[in-house]
């Protein structure tokens, strides 16, 4: 289980009828590959005109207990992929200055795309400048169309990056989302030193326990960070390597849900099971519901069915403390193994939540630290939420699961 998935999963969405007011759908998974694309995980991704941009992450699979997160196994290329033709373009990060290059080959960074800009925060990796493994105190703004043109056409790379240094962004394993021009940097931790079994006291680690908000302004072609703030919750936000997904809540308000994640304070290898709803006005833990089947960052996609006022979030594989057997009985494994489970968490019209596993499974124990790339032309609502009601009847290619640890 220390390799990386080099195939791409084609995720197909089947839309049958509705039953008893609850929208039903099924899934099918197939595989494809892009020649020359390395196995990636824990990377950043963006899209433009049907093509994909990948930056950072790892190519060595699950980190080992010793000599983890070495530079030699970092993704040191910028990749542009055309999923329709299978064409791949790559350019080395070595063409960039040290301080920029080092952050860009980090892992577990936070990222979100705003129009043509990829906002890339933090990340963990080896810094030759600092002579240590660090969480990068940087926010980097990336011109996606310009960079993709440079990668595919041989132009200069550096003009398409702007880096801002600020310890506010020294976070790894968190999540970054955007709502109404405000960025939400949620959860995660800061880790300084070598991540290994014998790190001992030679490390510094602390969880942010926070929702950090900020805005960006462009002045004279340069980006400025404005209006920083933070809300700290040492219980409910003490999580990393989790899933944060855009949501439409029962009353129609948009926001996010922080799902599961690791680790509960004071408990060894105990994931969070309760989600947290995040709105502009604040955050509230979901009471009376546990998410059992996806406890770690994995490929995911949010789907809203307006006719039923139901918000579905689909999760693909990853790591989980629980799994379903052939009889749909819930089994527990405190070692938190990799799983093949495909599951959904649904917010129903009355505001309650339910979780269910699909009959289909992933063909490998993968999905952890993978990314879901929507197929071009899929109808979406705010923040990339799939518009279920606008999808045609029958089977539909919804998107692709790229990378992940096997």
Where are these regions (language model features)?
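Blade-edge beta-strand/turn elements of extracellular beta-propeller
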Residues: 23-33, 86-100, 145-167, 214-235, ...
């Amino acid at each position: 289980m220390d390799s990386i998935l080099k195939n791409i999963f084609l995720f197909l969405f089947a839309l049958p009828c509705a039953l008893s007011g609850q929208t039903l759908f099924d899934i099918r998974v197939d595989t494809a590959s892009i020649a020359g694309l390395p196995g990636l995980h824990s990377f950043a991704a963006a899209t433009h005109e049907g093509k994909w941009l990948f930056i950072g992450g790892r190519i060595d699979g699950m980190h080992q207990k010793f000599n983890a997160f070495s530079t030699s196994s970092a993704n040191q290329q910028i990749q542009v992929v055309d999923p329709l033709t299978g064409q791949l373009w790559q350019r080395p990060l070595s063409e960039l200055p040290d301080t920029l290059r080092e952050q860009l080959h980090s892992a577990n960074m936070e990222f979100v795309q705003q129009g043509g800009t990829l906002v890339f925060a933090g990340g963990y990796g080896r810094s030759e400048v600092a002579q240590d493994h660090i969480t990068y105190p940087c926010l980097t703004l990336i011109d996606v169309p310009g960079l993709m043109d440079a990668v595919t056409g041989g132009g200069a790379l550096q003009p398409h990056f702007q880096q801002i240094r600020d310890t506010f962004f020294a976070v790894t394993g968190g999540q970054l989302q955007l709502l109404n021009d405000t960025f939400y940097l949620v959860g995660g931790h800061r880790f300084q030193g070598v991540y290994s079994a014998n790190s001992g006291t030679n490390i510094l680690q602390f969880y942010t326990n926070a929702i950090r908000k900020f805005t960006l302004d462009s002045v004279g072609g340069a980006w400025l960070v404005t209006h920083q703030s933070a809300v700290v919750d040492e219980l409910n936000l003490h999580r990393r390597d989790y899933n944060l997904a855009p949501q439409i809540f029962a009353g129609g308000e948009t926001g996010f849900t922080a799902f599961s994640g690791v680790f509960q304070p004071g408990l060894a290898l105990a994931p969070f099971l309760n989600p947290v709803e995040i709105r502009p006005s604040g955050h509230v833990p979901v009471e009376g519901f546990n998410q059992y089947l996806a406890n770690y960052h994995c490929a995911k996609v949010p789907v809203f069915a307006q006719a039923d006022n139901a918000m579905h979030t689909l999760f693909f594989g990853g790591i989980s403390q629980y799994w379903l057997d052939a009889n749909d009985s819930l089994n527990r494994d405190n070692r938190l193994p990799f799983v093949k489970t495909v599951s959904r968490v649904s917010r129903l019209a009355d505001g309650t939540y339910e979780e269910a596993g699909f009959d289909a499974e992933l063909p490998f124990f993968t999905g952890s630290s993978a990314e879901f790339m929507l197929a071009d032309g899929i109808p979406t609502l705010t923040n990339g939420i799939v518009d279920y009601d606008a999808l045609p009847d029958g089977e539909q290619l919804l998107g692709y699961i790229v990378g992940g640890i096997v």
